[in-house]
Amino acid sequence: MQLQQEKKKLLYSLCDVCNIQLHSAAQAQVHYNGKSHLKRVKQLNNGEVPKASASLAPTSLQSLSSSSSQGSSCHSNTLPTLVRTPSLMMQSGLDMKPFMTFPVESSSPVGLFPNFNTMDPVQKAVINHTFGVSIPPKKKQVISCNICQLRFNSDSQAEAHYKGSKHAKKLKAQESPKNKQKSAVAQDSGTKTITSTSTNTTTTTTTTSSCTAVTASCSDQTEKSTEPLAAHKVPASPQAFVPAPVAPAVALVPSPCKTAPVHASPPTEPTGLAVALKNTSKPAALPTAPSEPSVESEEEKAKKLLYCSLCKVAVNSLSQLEAHNTGSKHKTMLEARNGAGPIKAYPRPGSKLKVQATQLNKGSGLQNKTFHCEICDVHVNSEIQLKQHISSRRHKDRVAGKPTKPKYSPYNKQQRSSSSLAAKLALQNDLVKPISPAFLPSPFSTTTVPSISLHPRPNTSIFQTASLPHSFLRAAPGPIRPTTGSILFAPY
């Protein structure tokens, strides 16, 4: 039994032709009847026999031919001779992999294909992939925005992001604390300069009071001339520490005093005092400097914020802001605010002046106002309506000087008026017809015709069967008055 099992294993364990390991009889039968096995058998018949099976060449060829003729190689008698190879051959076959790698030289395909450089990039990629020419992958340039924490795939995406409003808002949010710190530092420096100037003013007041005391003593007692000298020398020591404002007080001192040593002692001081004056004139102008940036013009604010407060338009760049400022809409809004152009602004009745004053500083200056366009002769109640009117086709055409287009109507006004007049005349002619004289006697016909013809009366020919006799139509005594005929309602 063991021998039979070993024979069965040898029968369907390995196919030397295809170098494939088989695990069952059914699998071996399917493989030997398959196209790939038969194709390789044909190749072996046409070509040379491998070296490993050279000793078994005649038997193998016979077995292959018989297997191909019979159809199934499992039932052939010559199959064991093909399969029963030496033990070394069996071990090598079992160790081999099902797919054998064919080494190809890694030479560039340019030498193999003469037209390689003129090929399409797709063909080049296929050839490079098949022939194993490895192209070093290019590193992608990572474009990122550190402020918004975003990565981009191309330069165009990055440019669009940098020009966008989200990036601008985040930039402003990061720059605003820096600007606040700078403004705080500037305010601290301004307070320091103010305190220094206040100390200087206090020292000048003390020196002036001392100088007045000295002049009084000089006028009263000339014997005590040494005392003013001492009093004058006392403030000379703080002059080294106190800045320039002491100079005018010192200049005032010597004039009332008659003592010559006072004039002779400070000839070296005025040069130092003049230098101190120049130095003090500069810090005096510093406190005004911080007040200037606080009052910024509208243009500077618009450039910083990229926003036009007059037209209420947000912009992504300075170039767009300049283009907006040079546009006709912005100019007309400016003219409306200033009242220089054809659009005049008037205060709205009921609006408070205080509210207007606060809004003039904050907004566009066009709130709580009504407007009148002199070109189009249109009154507008708000700023939004003014913008709509300025951007309308009617206003643009009037400004450009184009003639007004007539509104579409199926008929003209002249035709309508003429047709209505003709209809009225026809009705009057039909209604106002003179009564024939046959109804009236001869003496009254001439007198009654014009009076009766003025009033329309219905045609009674429909209701009368025969003509009325003349006795009914005789005039009554007194003034003649036309009577309306009776209306008879008859059934159908």
UniProtKB/Swiss-Prot annotation:
Chain positions of all zinc fingers (Matrin-type): 8-44, 143-173, 303-337, 371-401
Q: Where is this region: Disordered?
A: 159-206, 388-420
Name of protein: Zinc finger protein 385B
Q: Which PANTHER family match?
A: DOUBLE-STRANDED RNA-BINDING ZINC FINGER PROTEIN, ZINC FINGER PROTEIN 385B
Q: Does the keyword Oxidoreductase apply?
A: no
Q: Per its database record, what is this protein's job? A: May play a role in p53/TP53-mediated apoptosis.
> Per its UniProt entry, which superkingdom is the organism in?
Eukaryota
Signal sequence span is none
Question: Could you tell me the keywords of this UniProt record?
Answer: Apoptosis, Metal-binding, Nucleus, Repeat, Zinc, Zinc-finger
Q: What is its main location?
A: nucleus
List the Gene Ontology MF annotations in alphabetical order. Answer: nucleic acid binding; zinc ion binding
Gene Ontology process terms (BP): intrinsic apoptotic signaling pathway by p53 class mediator
In this chain, composition skew of type Low complexity spans: 189-206
Write out the annotated subcellular location: Nucleus
* Gene Ontology CC annotations of this record: nucleus
Return the InterPro entries for the record.
Matrin/U1-like-C_Znf_C2H2, Znf385, Znf_C2H2_sf, Znf_C2H2_type
Q: Gene3D superfamilies per the record?
A: Classic Zinc Finger
